[in-house]
């Protein structure tokens, strides 16, 4: 079985989790996902990650160690987007 592409990983996550924003970057060996989902509201980071792993199911079992992620609620994402827009030095 060939390694998943960033598009594959993105699709896997989107299939199992309602995301408001989902971006996956990677080089085929390592993946970094930014996942914004209302499902994360009130959840600690560990639970958020568990939800993402559950969404992936067996599809990423081999590569799961290669996936790092940032899990945000829509409110956290909005706050972060606003902050990054105000970085004028």
Predicted ranges, named:
Residues 1-20:
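N-proximal, solvent-exposed amphipathic alpha-helical segments enriched in charged/polar residues
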Residues 16-32:
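Short edge beta-strands and adjacent turn/loop segments
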Residues 29, 38-40, 74:
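Residue-level signature for short turns and capping positions that connect secondary-structure elements
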Residues 34-47:
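A short interface-forming secondary-structure element
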Residues 55-89:
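C-terminal structural segments of small proteins and small subunits
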